[in-house]
Amino acid sequence: MGDWSFLGEFLEEVHKHSTVIGKVWLTVLFIFRMLVLGTAAESSWGDEQADFRCDTIQPGCQNVCYDQAFPISHIRYWVLQIIFVSTPSLVYMGHAMHTVRMQEKQKLREAEKAKEAGGTGTYEYLAEKAELSCWKEVNGKIVLQGTLLNTYVCTILIRTAMEVAFMVGQYLLYGIFLDTLHVCRRSPCPHPVNCYVSRPTEKNVFIVFMMAVAGLSLFLSLAELYHLGWKKIRQRLAKSRQGDKHQLLGPSTSLVQGLTPPPDFNQCLKNSPDEKFFSDFSNNMGSRKNPDPLATEEVPNQEQIPEEGFIHTQYGQKPEQPSGASAGHRFPQGYHSDKRRLSKASSKARSDDLSV
């Protein structure tokens, strides 16, 4: 087996900028696949061709039978599976780093323009803001957003398809378990030849283990798709429903809010001597009508009218109530509450006065 350090360093960077389920998936990939494959599984398949025996001395027959039994070695097949499954994550990491660098350059250009205009800024602050625009961490959880979220979802879809393809391919090539006896009927073997696999039980244990880990990785990928995709769809549907409710309630609310009284309407009612007829405009807006809108403005102005030598017609004079009028129909208290004496007529004789 080769050195896994190069691939491990890249996957560590992916681990830093993944969701919680993505971190679990990477942990499974590191421990249960790469570590087990590099230590235990490789030693079990190290002698498979040397210990593969057939009941024949025909030259080339044993090699042909081994090629028929193992089109590709299990260990090499799993290495290819790990590489193909990990490649989308590496592409995502490359796109994330490229996005961060581009945003850092953009922020730096904006800072230089602001500095020329009289502002200040630092590169470290801009780099931090650029990173937060791609992803943000809330309570220890990574929340992806923007184009980086779309790339991450595509990465999960590709690796899910790879997992399914390799699991189906392994089942079609080998099945689930290895047989101890393999019967070979290929040329140049003169007749059916019995061949024997080395340590089949130990190899079957690793085959089942690797299949189970692949199934676990597939389940985690589907769970992460649900976490990122389905919840986002539900949130958008909820927002659209709330927007429809606001649109339905919006016109009626604005109509009610648009019907407002004059600024001094309630104050005029409160300043009246008798507050029997006072009520807030907002409570019963259309219950009563003001018979004369100018009356509330003219009564306070009577204090400013100077007493001159002619008779004034005042709104505060109590009118005569007809005998047929009902007691329930009363004028507002402010209408005849002014008890000041009427302005007296001049003592000088006028031509139109009646002689007694």
Swiss-Prot record:
What is the first-listed, main subcellular location in coarse terms? membrane
Q: What InterPro entries does the annotation carry?
A: Connexin, Connexin40, Connexin_C, Connexin_CCC, Connexin_CS, Connexin_N, Connexin_N_sf, Cx40_C
The residue spans the entry assigns to the Extracellular side of the membrane are as follows: 41-76, 185-204
Q: Tissue specificity, please?
A: Highly expressed in lung.
What biological processes does GO assign it?
A: angiogenesis; artery morphogenesis; atrial cardiac muscle cell to AV node cell communication by electrical coupling; atrial septum development; atrial septum morphogenesis; atrial ventricular junction remodeling; AV node cell to bundle of His cell communication; AV node cell to bundle of His cell communication by electrical coupling
Organism domain of life: Eukaryota
Q: Which residues carry this modification: Phosphoserine?
A: S351, S355
Q: Which UniProt keywords apply?
A: Cell junction, Cell membrane, Gap junction, Membrane, Phosphoprotein, Transmembrane, Transmembrane helix
Subcellular localization(s) per the UniProt record: Cell membrane; Cell junction, Gap junction
May I have one GO cellular component term?
Answer: gap junction
Taken from the record, one Pfam family name reads Connexin40_C
Chain residue ranges for the region called Disordered: 241-266, 279-356
Residue ranges spanning the membrane: these are 20-40, 77-97, 164-184, 205-225
* Subunit structure of this chain's protein: A connexon is composed of a hexamer of connexins.
* UniProt family annotation: Belongs to the connexin family. Alpha-type (group II) subfamily.
Question: What is the annotated role of this protein in its UniProt record?
Answer: One gap junction consists of a cluster of closely packed pairs of transmembrane channels, the connexons, through which materials of low MW diffuse from one cell to a neighboring cell.
Concerning PANTHER family, the annotation shows: CONNEXIN, GAP JUNCTION ALPHA-5 PROTEIN
This one is known as Gap junction alpha-5 protein
What's the source species for this entry?
A: Rattus norvegicus (Rat)
